[in-house]
A protein has these predicted regions:
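Structured alpha/beta reader/binder surfaces that contact nucleic acids or chromatin modification marks
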Residues: 1-182
Length: 182
């Protein structure tokens, strides 16, 4: 079994395109808080109504591809990642300083992340994304549903070459620490 993190499909495509280098996590509805189940994982793509309103306009070209990866019948797993750094947000008022590192609107981050369980801190994951050599189609099952961060998949795909270098992501991690860490 392989660990997979549920992540919005648009973000997975942004990671693969090199537009995004971070994830913003607080945990699912059925979790008290986000915990890192593994430092290397696949992405299980998800989709939600209102995706377009959550993504900045300059990234709307990702939405058609993203929607096709997460349907009622199946998901297409096309990427994985390694965590370079996990940084708790100590200065949420400074999140705009790292907006260039992700595709989400400021309103989406506030509503979907900061206002959800406001006593719990948001975590920024700096990740090194990898495309899979061949995408894997998985039938959607009942155990994939629900508001949890992690699922186990019975797949062992071959990983391709990382999107970003280690040194580039070390600079991203430093920028995140300086901007919002605490």
């Amino acid at each position: 079994m392989t660990t997979a993190l549920k992540e919005w499909s648009a973000a997975v495509h942004a990671l693969l395109d090199g537009r995004q280098t971070i994830l913003l996590r607080k945990g699912g509805i059925h979790e008290k808080r986000f915990t890192l189940a593994d430092s290397r994982f696949l992405f299980f793509p998800t989709a939600v109504h209102g995706h377009a309103e959550r993504v900045r306009p300059e990234h709307h070209d990702l939405l058609p591809r993203a929607g096709a990866d997460s349907t009622e019948a199946q998901v297409v797993v096309r990427a994985g990642a390694e965590v370079v750094a996990a940084i708790e947000v100590g200065r949420p008022e400074e999140l705009e300083e790292i907006a260039a590192l992700h595709i989400w609107t400021a309103e989406s981050i506030r509503a979907d992340r900061l206002d959800f369980r406001p006593k719990h801190r948001l975590t920024v994951l700096v990740v090194r994304a990898y495309p899979l050599v061949a995408p894997v189609r998985i039938p959607r099952r009942d155990e994939h549903r629900g508001c949890s961060s992690w699922v186990q998949l019975d797949v062992a795909p071959q990983w391709g070459t990382a999107v970003h270098t280690e040194s580039a992501l070390a600079r991203v991690a430093q920028r995140v620490r300086e901007s919002v860490g605490g």
